[in-house]
């Protein structure tokens, strides 16, 4: 069954938290990439569904999907923070090869400024930035404005955002307020950081399987 547009936001963030997007990843047919927007099903392995064809665009306001026909207020209880006013913009090599963190952030600001009118306005609208686990930023804009980001140099994905920490209405990454990075309290920071996989959560083989494999390796 297809997932709602925002349904794979958490899958996307999990993937991004483990991969630095220095080059475009292998993209399945369901993402909006390099200027064409995702359909409404899944992200990365269903990043927002529908087939992605060159030049096609998607809007949750005009999609025929049963999920995307639901207004944001209906989707919010399932994916807190997904209101189509907060967007995650993932970029490829912001600031160029070997850019410093500040150069990346400057690139984020300059990119958003192209659709909101000025760098000062862009600084007000960017609420988080990421320069390590993935390369991109979160910004508060309406859906129509978000479509204008598609196809801009360096923009890989334009994705509806959702909370990493719903209790504090926090979208994760590094907080960005009026052009400056703001530190969270240690407690809040722990809530948005990716948690290391626990040993008991890792897949394990039973003793018979391990014994069988040891025998095969000795042949």
From Swiss-Prot:
- Please classify the protein's predominant subcellular localization into one broad category: plastid
- Top-rank taxon, per record: Eukaryota
Q: Name one GO molecular function term.
A: protein dimerization activity
Q: What happens when the gene is disrupted?
A: Small plants with white leaves that do not contain chlorophyll. Mutant plants are unable to grow autotrophically on soil and flowers are sterile.
Ordered alphabetically, the record's keywords are:
Chloroplast, mRNA processing, Plastid, Transit peptide
A single GO BP term for this record reads: cytidine to uridine editing
Which InterPro entries does the record cross-reference, listed alphabetically? MORF/ORRM1/DAG-like, MORF/ORRM1/DAG-like_MORF, S8pro/Inhibitor_I9_sf
- Region called Disordered, residue ranges: 182-219
Q: Which cysteines are joined by disulfide bonds?
A: none
Q: Which positions form the organelle transit peptide?
A: 1-48
From the Swiss-Prot or TrEMBL record, state where the protein is found. Plastid, Chloroplast
Question: What Pfam families does the annotation carry?
Answer: MORF_dom
Q: Which Gene Ontology CC terms are recorded?
A: chloroplast; endoplasmic reticulum; mitochondrion
Task: Indicate, by first and last residue, each region the UniProt record lists as having compositional bias (Basic and acidic residues).
Answer: 185-219
Subunit info? Homodimer and heterodimer with MORF9. Interacts with protoporphyrinogen oxidase 1 PPOX1. Heterodimers with MORF8/RIP1 and MORF9/RIP9. Interacts with PCMP-A2/PMD1. Interacts with ORRM1. Interacts with ORRM6.
UniProt xrefs under PANTHER family: MULTIPLE ORGANELLAR RNA EDITING FACTOR 2, CHLOROPLASTIC-RELATED, MULTIPLE ORGANELLAR RNA EDITING FACTOR 2, CHLOROPLASTIC-RELATED-RELATED
To which protein family does this belong? Answer: Belongs to the MORF family.
Report the protein's function.
Involved in plastid rRNA processing and consequently in translation and early chloroplast differentiation. Involved in organellar RNA editing. Required for the processing of multiple editing sites in plastids.
Provide the protein name.
Multiple organellar RNA editing factor 2, chloroplastic
Q: State the species of origin.
A: Arabidopsis thaliana (Mouse-ear cress)
Name of the gene this protein is made from: MORF2
């Amino acid at each position: 069954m297809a997932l709602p547009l925002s349904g794979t936001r958490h899958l996307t963030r999990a993937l991004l938290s483990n991969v630095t997007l220095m080059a475009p990843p292998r993209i399945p047919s369901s993402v909006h990439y390099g200027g064409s927007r995702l359909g409404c099903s899944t992200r990365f392995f269903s990043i927002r569904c529908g087939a992605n064809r060159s030049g096609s665009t998607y809007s949750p306001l005009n999609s025929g999907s049963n999920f995307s026909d639901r207004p944001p207020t209906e989707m919010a209880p399932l994916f807190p923070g997904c209101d189509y006013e907060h967007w995650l913009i993932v970029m490829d090599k912001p600031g160029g090869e070997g850019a410093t963190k500040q150069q990346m952030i400057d690139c984020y600001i300059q990119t958003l400024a192209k659709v909101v009118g000025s760098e000062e306005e862009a600084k007000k609208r960017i609420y988080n930035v990421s320069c390590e686990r993935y390369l991109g930023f979160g910004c508060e804009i309406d859906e129509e404005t978000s479509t204008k980001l598609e196809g801009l140099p360096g923009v890989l994905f334009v994705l509806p955002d959702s909370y990493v920490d719903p209790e504090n209405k926090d979208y994760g990454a590094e907080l960005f307020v009026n052009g400056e990075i703001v530190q969270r309290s240690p407690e809040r920071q722990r809530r948005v950081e990716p948690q290391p996989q626990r040993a008991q959560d890792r897949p394990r083989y039973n003793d018979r399987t391990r014994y069988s494999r040891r025998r095969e390796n000795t042949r």
